[in-house]
Amino acid sequence: MSQPPLLDHATQTMANGSKSFATAAKLFDPATRRSVLMLYTWCRHCDDVIDDQTHGFASEAAAEEEATQRLARLRTLTLAAFEGAEMQDPAFAAFQEVALTHGITPRMALDHLDGFAMDVAQTRYVTFEDTLRYCYHVAGVVGLMMARVMGVRDERVLDRACDLGLAFQLTNIARDIIDDAAIDRCYLPAEWLQDAGLTPENYAARENRAALARVAERLIDAAEPYYISSQAGLHDLPPRCAWAIATARSVYREIGIKVKAAGGSAWDRRQHTSKGEKIAMLMAAPGQVIRAKTTRVTPRPAGLWQRPV
């Protein structure tokens, strides 16, 4: 039997957009997997619309809109989805289903869109705190929404989900420094660039790769406490959800390890995990879940960045 069109669209979106997460997503039970795919579809669509990688809307005129106008339309359609309006776009129909089913709040969705607003405004990040704030909007709040899909309502567990999103995004930033620079985006703290003898104007130059590698290493090291904190969140997830998240956590963390190990050559090719490595992590993840579920959960470290409440 073929999949329903909406699910088929969501499945293809995940396959095209995130090979790192696609493997882990297969581990969810069917109902949770459907909701995860639906949520991812909306996130991916919003990202593509802001970057003008897809028209995103039925009218050809939409492709000519300025980014600020595209962002405003995304906000309007997102709020309409919450209000129960009939959604013609598959991405918003998918989001409407998952948001209304799992109690995702308008604030969560709008917080995510605020991250795209930071890109539209070409926000510059001076401190690591500034970078973490961006990471919250584009990934930490996605962790919150994904956790709600998995049945999480405890604020302490949601904190751990947010931590994993922060860790994922810090890893993404380190991996994609040069690709982002090519489209005039820099998420690295200017203070860290200065510490390495770099500037926002010259950090991406090939002759500065050794110094840039030190900044990337610092970023990967900064992600580690958030990866560690997120481990405790597995304790309260349903078993198959915990298995999927533990796998995704291992895959993304390994990408950071590869970036760090490659040094100045980290951006000569896109750092990734092989199919064999993903399978090995998938098989090792149940052990992580068992440890998390049989270990007393300690309080979240006070020094970690705290999401807005």
UniProtKB/Swiss-Prot annotation:
Keywords: Carotenoid biosynthesis, Magnesium, Manganese, Metal-binding, Transferase. This is Phytoene synthase. It is an enzyme of class 2 (transferase). It comes from Pseudescherichia vulneris (Escherichia vulneris). InterPro entries: Isoprenoid_synthase_dom_sf, Phytoene_synthase-rel, Squ/phyt_synthse, Squalene/phytoene_synthase_CS, Trans_IPPS_bact-type, Trans_IPPS_HH. The keyword Metal-binding applies. CDD domains: Trans_IPPS_HH. Its cofactor is ATP; Mn(2+); Mg(2+). Involved in the biosynthesis of carotenoids. Catalyzes the condensation of two molecules of geranylgeranyl diphosphate (GGPP) to give prephytoene diphosphate (PPPP) and the subsequent rearrangement of the cyclopropylcarbinyl intermediate to yield phytoene. The lineage of its organism: Bacteria, Pseudomonadati, Pseudomonadota, Gammaproteobacteria, Enterobacterales. Belongs to the phytoene/squalene synthase family. It comes from the Bacteria. Pathway: Carotenoid biosynthesis; phytoene biosynthesis.
